[in-house]
From Swiss-Prot:
Belongs to the radical SAM superfamily. Biotin synthase family. It is an enzyme of class 2 (transferase). It comes from Syntrophobacter fumaroxidans (strain DSM 10017 / MPOB). Keywords: 2Fe-2S, 4Fe-4S, Biotin biosynthesis, Iron, Iron-sulfur, Metal-binding, S-adenosyl-L-methionine, Transferase. This is Biotin synthase.
Length: 326
């Protein structure tokens, strides 16, 4: 990193302010021996805004496969031939049971995730009824249900959903390489509608899709402008049968650099590390020192995660206090 970048990192750490796009790009070029300096800054920013608080979340694949969209990475797209399960919306009792099971873990959020561009009114009303009738003070309801309009989002909010997840996936300049069945503007409109109805915004994407480093910074800068509440970072897991099946996965240190860059550009947003984390191997524990405030645990959508007991043991080894999980 340039001397000016180190200076800018230290200033950002002291003030808790976002770094410039120029500094962010330099973060992605940090040499291995510069990673400790980068982690010092990212950890300082995390602690300034979040203390030692960490947040674990889990999700339920509540409707799978047969998606009309052609996202290049996705095993659930009907445009791809994969081994992903295909099933309709789960019964409300199944969703409620999964929520109650999650409440027995130290997770603070439980997300209901459905495939497809958007759920029907009937399905949304069914999920809203489940949320309305199932609650636990330990776990907040989240939803990820595609491109919904304000009226549908409002219905979910009134039922008890507190946060809506809708990824932009990548930089706007790279999105046409990833999806052709809908545009970036539609996704961005949904993100803004979520904010307008008063739900918290969970919005991030997948890194390692083939985007340039400049586009990775472009993406982080957009999330900063949108002032999202939480940024879930996924790392591409190439799935056989998808258009990106042959793309090599990111290297662990590149993942660390990217987490730190998103943290330094979005100092007040939660940064959660989700799918692809297992590919970091022995470096998984480093994510918190790169600025992450949480991670997704348990089953994912179409790729394997790590067993929850291993993740909880990792947090114990890091000596995060039990009170840190909220």
């Amino acid at each position: 990193m340039k001397p000016s970048t180190v200076k800018n990192l230290r200033r950002a750490a002291d003030r808790g302010e976002p770094v410039s796009e120029e500094t962010a790009f330099d973060i992605l070029l940090a040499r291995p021996d510069e990673i400790p300096e980068l982690m010092n800054a990212a950890t300082a920013v995390r602690r300034r805004h979040f203390g030692e608080r960490l947040q674990l979340c889990s999700i339920l694949n509540a409707r799978s496969g047969a998606c009309s969209e052609d996202c290049a990475f996705c095993a659930q797209s009907a445009h791809h031939e994969t081994h992903a399960e295909v099933f309709g919306l789960l019964d409300g009792n199944e969703i409620a049971a999964a929520y109650r099971k999650a409440a027995e873990l130290p997770v603070s959020r439980f997300g209901v995730v459905t495939s497809g561009r958007a759920l029907s009114d009937e399905d949304i009303e069914a999920i809203a009824a489940t949320v309305r009738n199932t609650s636990d003070p330990r776990v907040a309801w989240c939803a990820s249900m595609g491109c919904l309009d304000r009226s549908r989002l409002q219905l979910l909010k009134e039922a008890g959903v507190s946060r809506f997840h809708h990824n932009l996936e990548t930089a706007e300049s790279y999105f046409p390489e990833i999806c052709s069945t809908h545009g970036y503007a539609q996704r961005l409109d949904t993100v803004r509608a979520v904010r307008e109805v008063g739900l918290e915004v969970c919005c991030g994407g997948i890194l390692g899709l083939g985007e340039s480093l400049e586009q990775r910074v472009e993406f982080a800068a957009l999330l900063a402008r949108e002032e999202v509440d939480c940024i879930p970072l996924n790392f591409l897991v190439p799935i056989p049968g998808t258009r990106l099946e042959a793309r090599p996965p990111m290297k662990p240190l590149d993942m660390i650099r990217s987490i730190a860059m998103f943290r330094m550009m979005n100092p007040k947003a939660e940064v959660k590390v989700c799918a692809g984390r297992v590919r970091m191997g022995d470096l998984q524990a480093v994510i918190f020192y790169a600025g992450a405030t949480g991670m997704m645990v348990g089953p994912l959508l179409t790729v394997a995660g790590r067993d929850v007991s291993s993740d909880l043991r990792m947090l114990e080894d890091l000596e995060f206090p039990a009170s840190a999980l909220n």
